[in-house]
Amino acid sequence: MNYQPTPEDRFTFGLWTVGWQGRDPFGDATRPALDPVEAVQRLAELGAYGVTFHDDDLIPFGSSDAEREAHVKRFRQALDATGMTVPMATTNLFTHPVFKDGAFTANDRDVRRYALRKTIRNIDLAVELGAKVYVAWGGREGAESGAAKDVRAALDRMKEAFDLLGEYVTSQGYDIRFAIEPKPNEPRGDILLPTIGHALAFIERLERPELYGVNPEVGHEQMAGLNFPHGIAQALWAGKLFHIDLNGQSGIKYDQDLRFGAGDLRAAFWLVDLLESAGWEGPRHFDFKPPRTEDIDGVWASAAGCMRNYLILKERAAAFRADPEVQEALRAARLDQLAEPTAADGLQALLADRTAYEDFDVDAAAARGMAFERLDQLAMDHLLGARG
């Protein structure tokens, strides 16, 4: 297989990823700022399909209207020259100190109103640039102490904010949907909507739930000790996977944002297998940080590695599914039975079926082996390149 990415692979990157300067809580930047236009050009050369942005990635915070217009014009020219797209955009509601207690759920009402206006302004730009998805990450929505936040009231304010944004895009006739990005543990001590499950439950309480889905990130679910492919499967099952952030993570620790494929390689394999077998048509969006050890050449090597690793895993997953021995092992593990309804004949037939209870041989059923180890080893063989 050719591991050279093309726009048909639909790989996208946030401007904040390749543009990260390496500044962290313990050290200053190790790289100079990256011009968004250069980011567009270099990513296009690598074979990417598009770029995404926070408002402040593209337009420095506090810019005048004239400065804003100039930044957008340069960016649009770069998009036109390279053929790159903007499938998604989002708002930075976490960097400026005004958001120290949150944005949509800040205790200060005037901060909440400012956060909504800031978001609405960038939604207009996102639609202008062709984005179909608007991501919302509530990184500062939470607390460090119990009395500091009335969580029920905060969820009311969160619902109010999303309902207002839904009203706005509907009134404007915008063809755009929202994707809530869950994350636990940082930067707030306890963050609202920390996992996929929290976000899915919240969405069902909104006035226009059809406008809202999730934007799960590999590292975020793993920070909570959860199985990311399982979370994605549930989001797909619910029809709520509107966007996805790909990166790498090594277990339950801080948000590492490694390049995709680094960290938990088995989880990355099963994730790619799931996305490809499910026919996921959205972008494969990389939200990672090139390590602060790298110079600018290392930034592009890291970005290229994200795409290459996805394509390698895509090839390995396809070989796994096409392997006749794997197909036989799947049947031995009775995956075909799992796809069958348990009681398609209805409740009354189930209650009348003596083989379902009275005559069911529980000891014989308990003695059946599931053959999962053989199946898993076949997957390992394909992942490690020993088969196919």
From Swiss-Prot:
Segment forming the signal sequence: none
Binding site for Mg(2+) 1: E181, E217, D245, D287
PROSITE patterns given in the database record: XYLOSE_ISOMERASE
Catalytic site positions: H54, D57
Location within or outside the cell: Cytoplasm
Residues that, per the record, bind Mg(2+) 2: E217, H220, D255, D257
Annotated EC: 5.3.1.5
SUPFAM superfamilies, per database record: Xylose isomerase-like
Cofactor annotation: Mg(2+)
MF terms (GO), sorted A to Z: magnesium ion binding; xylose isomerase activity
HAMAP family, A to Z: Xylose_isom_A
Protein name: Xylose isomerase
Gene designation: xylA
